[in-house]
Amino acid sequence: MISPIEPGQEWTVESFTPKDAQGVADLFLGIYGREYPVRIYVEPDLLIEENRSGRVISSVAKTAKGDIVGHNALFNSSPCKKVFESGAGLVHADYRGGHGIFTQMATHGLTKGRERSDVEQVFGEPVCNHPFTQKLSRNLKFVTRAIEINLMPAATYAKEASATGRVTTLLDFITLKSSPRTVHVPKAYESIFPIFYENMDDERQFVLSAKPLSSQRSTTLDTQVFDFAQVARVAVKALSLDFPTVMQAEEDRLLKQGVRVVQVWLSSGDPCVGEAVDSLRSSGYFFGGVLPRWFDSDGILMEKLVDEPVWEEINLYFERSQTLMALIRKDWEAVRGLNPKDKGRAGQ
């Protein structure tokens, strides 16, 4: 049984220690229930091991009694091991609303990231069913670079009843350690790439992607499927002339598993990326944005959906995300025109 926490206590934000693990698990279980899909945060021994190994860097809000009233973490979820996500954040219901806990935990995580040699870029996924995390991200100097349409099912937010349909998220980035890169720009997106890279906090050199796909190597994919969300993320590790065939076979496999959102990550460090983008667009994928340092080189997000987005229910608080969304929606509509049979949607 989860012990109640006395409201109104003083608290501080600190680095996670093993004795905090049960309190973090209780917090997640109390808010999200026992079906929470990421087991690291509801199984104390796993959380201790992940923090010990450095794969997770947890920050906790703790009272003088030792009660855990908040948690946020940095963790690696991109192909590049030097890019960490800021997430797994939550605050006890009695400690929400103007206390600043979430902001302090996220700030604490960035401070710890700057102290470590293995954390060079951090990103977050502010949800678009309410403005809080969008405001937090902006206040911490993150910049929106991509938007994940229909990422999370409404069931994820059922306990707090904050969504009626699938929830879209932003992808916001901040550079902690400079690492200049060359970006190969697909011809299809030559006019809009500069907008997605506006206010970039690191150096980028842009060249047009003009090299054709080659048969000298084979296409290599690394796919993650998130069954609870019905989402698949396909990291393209190597591009070859067989990419259209390999990708179509992978998509067919994923749709048979019940996947409703397919994301494809391409490296814009590859001079052939433009032809891969053209292939994906001809198969119903639309542009989602850019991903700094995603493969160590930058990445490009392409998306395909089974369900048509309810665009009007995507709540965007800032002008920048509204501008990017308009460009993304325009490409979604253009791709529908290229694929009249399925209207730009996977599996329909």
Describe the role of every protein-language-model region.
Residues 56-60, 71, 169, 277, ...:
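Short hydrophobic/aromatic beta-strand element in the GNAT-like acyltransferase core
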Residues 15-93, 126-127, 222-230, 237-242, ...:
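A conserved beta-strand-loop-helix scaffold within acyl/acetyltransferase catalytic domains
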Residues 197-289, 293:
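Non-catalytic interaction/regulatory modules that flank or connect domains
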